[in-house]
Amino acid sequence: DRIERAFGVKRADAEQLAGDPVTAAFFEEAAAGLSGKAAQTVANLVVNELAAYLKASGVALGESGIAPAQVASLAKLLASDAISSNQAHEGFEAMAASGDDPEKIVDERGMRQVSDAGALQPIVDEVLAACADQAQQYRDGNHKVIGFLVGQCMKASRGKGNPKLFNELLRASLS
């Protein structure tokens, strides 16, 4: 209850975090000074990525070598849309294996998402030209096809484009 109020994270996550004093202390250190989306992102990383890593490796949190500051850094990258959730997963695994800072991992591996509309619009235009049938389906009311078009944009950008921004640009171009 205290974690939920203090950091604004979802109740289920707060309960899971509070269930273990070591995990709760780790979360609180990682989320210090954060609230809202960034704090929830830390909670998600601790509850999902960290818990899965600890279970798979059979290592206790205190012996994992993963620091709260590393999780906070990864959470900030994810919350700011600098990386996608898939890239956060990849970054977490690399961080756990190497002990490197997530910023360094993201930069060395070229994982940072492109979130510049000016850079992504030409890709959107190419995809819409190549997928004229799907574009027409969208205009005719089949809005589910947007997922396919976002996927084509992601493929064309080799995973570097921000999918949320592609979605917005596609919808704007198709309206």
How should these model regions be labeled?
Residues D1-S175:
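Charged, compositionally biased, marginally structured helical/coil segments
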